[in-house]
């Protein structure tokens, strides 16, 4: 696994051995960041279910201002910190929160934190034909505090398996879907942003479509 673009491109990142971790594939990361383009530059980033930190490190390499990473596993969080050192970034631009994602979301919302990008590629759920998904991806979509954490015009980029049929609550608006193999990366904006001028900046480059990998 490596950083695919920016000033730390081609740096090889560590992946914990013997642990249930599923890093976002390099081809998927490239597709995501090609779509995001200059939106990453200067952004304050929040990565949920951060694991090795691959997505937030990719953001920092491509010009993001700072990143907050939430990861429940202390062993994964230690690998994340090691990858941060490998990438050569200044320590003050990264905050690692070793805690449950949903506890962290509540605390960040109460603190009034805001982010230009929220990234999450959580562990996949089971196939859910004929019933509502119970996956982590669905739980994130259902979490009412999450859209509150987005700056005006901000985006949530959410990974899930194509077997996971998600229900998108009314406070989100789908902007784009990227597909590669079994992976889907879904771009969403808070519904409040699609009702004002900020939506124009999102919808023009992020018209909903599907790209097959």
Regions from the PLM with identified roles:
Residues 1-213:
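Class I S-adenosyl-L-methionine-dependent methyltransferase catalytic core
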């Amino acid at each position: 696994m490596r950083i695919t673009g920016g000033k730390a491109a081609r740096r090889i990142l560590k992946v914990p051995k013997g642990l249930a971790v599923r890093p976002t594939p390099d081809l998927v990361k490239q597709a995501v960041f090609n779509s995001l383009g200059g939106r990453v530059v200067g952004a304050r980033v929040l990565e949920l279910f951060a694991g090795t930190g691959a997505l937030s490190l990719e953001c920092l390499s491509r010009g993001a201002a700072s990143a907050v990473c939430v990861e429940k596993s202390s062993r994964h969080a230690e690998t994340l910190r090691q990858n941060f050192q490998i990438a050569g970034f200044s320590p003050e631009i990264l905050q690692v929160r070793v805690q449950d994602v949903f506890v962290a979301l509540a605390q960040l919302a109460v603190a009034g934190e805001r982010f230009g990008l929220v990234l999450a590629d959580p562990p996949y759920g089971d196939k859910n034909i004929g019933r509502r998904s119970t996956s982590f991806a669905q739980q994130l979509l259902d979490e009412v505090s999450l859209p509150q954490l987005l700056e005006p015009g901000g985006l949530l980029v959410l990974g899930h398996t194509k077997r996971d049929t998600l229900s998108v609550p009314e406070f989100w608006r789908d902007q784009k879907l990227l597909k590669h193999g079994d992976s889907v990366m879904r771009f969403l904006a808070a519904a409040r942003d699609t009702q004002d001028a900020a939506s124009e900046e999102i919808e023009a480059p992020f018209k909903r479509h599907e790209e097959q990998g």
